[in-house]
């Protein structure tokens, strides 16, 4: 009985981990001041670029940066800069 309970618990934990890794994480692909996606094939600066856009984490996916939990209103570089200027002026 204890062995089957332990086996069930380990299986459940493994499935939860797979869900976390393989689950669809909401996010967005940020664009620079020219409206172009940040490329990351040569220089992977996704974490830095995502932090500029207000996201806490980013990584290279299919040759461009993807930022986890990046809202649509922070996707464009100029929208982020405008928010910062508005914040400084108030």
From Swiss-Prot:
<keyword id="KW-0800">Toxin</keyword>
<comment type="function">
    <text>The edited BmKBTx-like may modulate voltage-gated sodium channels (Nav).</text>
</comment>
<keyword id="KW-0964">Secreted</keyword>
<dbReference type="Pfam" id="PF00537">
    <property type="entry name" value="Toxin_3"/>
</dbReference>
<comment type="similarity">
    <text>Belongs to the long (3 C-C) scorpion toxin superfamily.</text>
</comment>
<keyword id="KW-0872">Ion channel impairing toxin</keyword>
<dbReference type="GO" id="GO:0090729">
    <property type="term" value="F:toxin activity"/>
</dbReference>
<keyword id="KW-0528">Neurotoxin</keyword>
<keyword id="KW-0732">Signal</keyword>
<keyword id="KW-1015">Disulfide bond</keyword>
<comment type="function">
    <text>The non-edited form is able to form a heterodimer. In orthologs, a heterodimer with LVP beta-chain induces lipolysis in rat adipocytes, which is mediated through the beta-2 adrenergic receptor pathway (ADRB2). Since no LVP beta-chains have been identified in the venom of this scorpion, it is possible that this protein is not involved in a lipolysis process.</text>
</comment>
<feature type="disulfide bond">
    <location>
        <begin position="40"/>
        <end position="60"/>
    </location>
</feature>
<comment type="subunit">
    <text>Monomer (edited version) and heterodimer (non-edited version) of this alpha chain and a beta chain (AC P0CI43).</text>
</comment>
<dbReference type="InterPro" id="IPR002061">
    <property type="entry name" value="Scorpion_toxinL/defensin"/>
</dbReference>
<dbReference type="GO" id="GO:0019871">
    <property type="term" value="F:sodium channel inhibitor activity"/>
</dbReference>
<protein>
    <recommendedName>
        <fullName>Putative sodium channel toxin Ts28</fullName>
    </recommendedName>
</protein>
<dbReference type="GO" id="GO:0005576">
    <property type="term" value="C:extracellular region"/>
</dbReference>
<dbReference type="InterPro" id="IPR044062">
    <property type="entry name" value="LCN-type_CS_alpha_beta_dom"/>
</dbReference>
<dbReference type="InterPro" id="IPR036574">
    <property type="entry name" value="Scorpion_toxin-like_sf"/>
</dbReference>
<feature type="disulfide bond">
    <location>
        <begin position="46"/>
        <end position="65"/>
    </location>
</feature>
<feature type="disulfide bond">
    <location>
        <begin position="50"/>
        <end position="67"/>
    </location>
</feature>
<keyword id="KW-0738">Voltage-gated sodium channel impairing toxin</keyword>
<feature type="domain" description="LCN-type CS-alpha/beta">
    <location>
        <begin position="26"/>
        <end position="86"/>
    </location>
</feature>
<feature type="signal peptide">
    <location>
        <begin position="1"/>
        <end position="23"/>
    </location>
</feature>
């Amino acid at each position: 009985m204890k062995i089957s309970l332990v086996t069930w618990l380990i299986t459940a934990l493994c499935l939860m981990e797979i869900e976390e890794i393989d689950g669809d994480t909401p996010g967005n692909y940020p664009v620079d001041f020219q409206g172009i996606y940040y490329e990351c094939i040569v220089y992977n600066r996704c974490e830095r670029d995502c932090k500029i856009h207000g996201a806490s984490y980013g990584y290279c996916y299919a040759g461009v940066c993807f930022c986890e939990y990046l809202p649509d209103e922070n996707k464009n570089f100029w929208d982020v800069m405008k928010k910062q200027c508005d914040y400084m002026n108030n």
